[in-house]
Amino acid sequence: MTQSTQTTPSNAASTTDTLLRLAAIIDSRKGGDPEVSYVSRLFHKGDDAVLKKIGEEATEVVLAAKDARHGGAPKALVGEVADLWFHCLVMLSHFDLSPADVLAELERREGMSGIEEKALRKSRDREQNGD
């Protein structure tokens, strides 16, 4: 059995710092040379290339999770999730968003049950659509 590293209040700041540092590096690749930077190449190719990578990486996470459940290496799952998170950071940057935006939304939802949050979201969507 592998040991999981849980985020606790004492190490949450360093986890957030890691995301923010990585996001800053990704942001710095905007306008960079697509011949020398993978991230610059994705930005240069546009929305479809960035979004396609999200789909590919999400599929790889699902497959790695299924493998891990059936005796595969948990480290492979962690690696695939890291790839997905990285490409999500690229996507956020591409759309001029940041990890702070996502963290703020998660904080807003914290302490609220998933059922309650979903009901509030549906109600808000109905109000916005004039239903």
From Swiss-Prot:
The pathway that the record names for this protein is: Amino-acid biosynthesis; L-histidine biosynthesis; L-histidine from 5-phospho-alpha-D-ribose 1-diphosphate: step 2/9
Q: Which GO terms describe its cellular component?
A: cytoplasm
Give one Pfam family, short name only.
PRA-PH
Task: Report whether Cell cycle shows up as a keyword of the record.
Answer: no
Q: Which reaction does it catalyse?
A: 1-(5-phospho-beta-D-ribosyl)-ATP + H2O = 1-(5-phospho-beta-D-ribosyl)-5'-AMP + diphosphate + H(+)
Q: Name the predominant localization.
A: cytoplasm
Which BP terms from GO are recorded?
A: L-histidine biosynthetic process
Q: What is its EC number?
A: 3.6.1.31
Keyword terms: Amino-acid biosynthesis, ATP-binding, Cytoplasm, Histidine biosynthesis, Hydrolase, Nucleotide-binding
**Annotated coiled-coil segments of the chain:** none
Localization per Swiss-Prot or TrEMBL: Cytoplasm
Q: Name one GO molecular function term.
A: ATP binding
Q: Does the keyword Transcription regulation apply?
A: no
UniProt xrefs under InterPro entries:
HisE, PRib-ATP_PPHydrolase-like
Family stated for the protein in its record: Belongs to the PRA-PH family.
NCBIfam families membership: histidine_hisI, PRK00400.1-3
- What is the protein's name according to its record? Phosphoribosyl-ATP pyrophosphatase
Species of origin reads Paraburkholderia xenovorans (strain LB400)
